[in-house]
Amino acid sequence: MASPVTVLENPIPKSGQHLLFFLTSKQQLALEQRPIESSLGYSAYVDHGVSQGVIVNPSSIAAAMRSSLITVYGITKPGTDKQYISVISPTYNLIANRQNQPIETTQKALAACSDNDRNNWVYYLNLPQGTAQYAIYELNIQDSTSAPTVYSGPTPSGNSNLAAVYFSPNKDRFIIFSNTDTRHYLYWVNSTLQSANRIAGTGSVMSASPLAATTITNVQTRSMTIFLYYMDVNTLLNRIVGKVTDNEIHWYANQVVEGAPPMKVDTLLTGVVVEEKWNCLYYIPDGDTEFRAFNDTIRDSFFDEPREG
């Protein structure tokens, strides 16, 4: 039986793509990014099946641009105890490994970043077989399958959230997490070196704090500024700024974000940089039930020198 079908031109400027929607043999929505120049190749959609349950909550979702298309990742759960890493928009499809098996996670954390081309990197936590210490797992997603890479050096807390950013001059990723210290701190790890580094001044971070990171890249100086936001033990929104050069980050002093409402203790957090002038943060304030926007104007005072604590 022939499938229903519809097509639109991708509205992203210079994408050169048609977005072709149709049904798979399992009667699920498929999307292929077909080049307008039909002689060019494309990746055929592979249906790994829909997770017959819900998007897990509490958990995390993450959005990234891939091949001129906004892709949203989440953790889904069928009617069993297993949870799977999935694409949840613009289609709903399990991500599979090279053996065509769905990729499991036992935890709630999820983060993603993009090279603004064909590559997405998705990060989550799992227990490597035969161990009791959680590890950060990385999926490099170019199509519908990926072989996980395990970061064996860092020791994230099992209830840690994650943030991830891409550094285009070196084609590196930086992942931020909270560690298993008695006193929680935030740490960062570089995708090339894979060793954990404590972020000085973050000793007030709340256990299981939400994390959000935005960036501004300077192509001429081959550097990047990271604006990292988190919740402290008093449920206040904190900010710490880092300057990336090569494989290193120089962190400045952490600061409570002036004027930001206290955070609901179980809220998550996300943000986006606007015109390189301010960061727009979304979270649920204490006593509220909806995500509210707060604009944090970028100032020179963000770059005070760091201190231990």
Curated annotation (Swiss-Prot):
Positions annotated with a glycan in the UniProt record: 190, 295
Membrane topology: Peripheral membrane protein
First-tier enzyme category under EC: hydrolase
Entry's localization field: Secreted, Cell wall; Membrane
A single GO cellular-component term on record: extracellular region
Coiled-coil zones: none
Keyword entries, A-Z: Cell wall, Glycoprotein, Hydrolase, Membrane, Protease, Secreted, Serine protease, Signal
SUPFAM superfamilies: Fucose-specific lectin
EC number per UniProt: 3.4.21.-
Any one GO biological process: proteolysis
Gene Ontology molecular function: serine-type peptidase activity
Record carries keyword Protease: yes
Superkingdom classification of source: Eukaryota
Keyword Secreted: yes
Main function: May participate in wall plasticization and/or intussusception or in cell wall turnover.
Protein name: Wall-associated proteinase
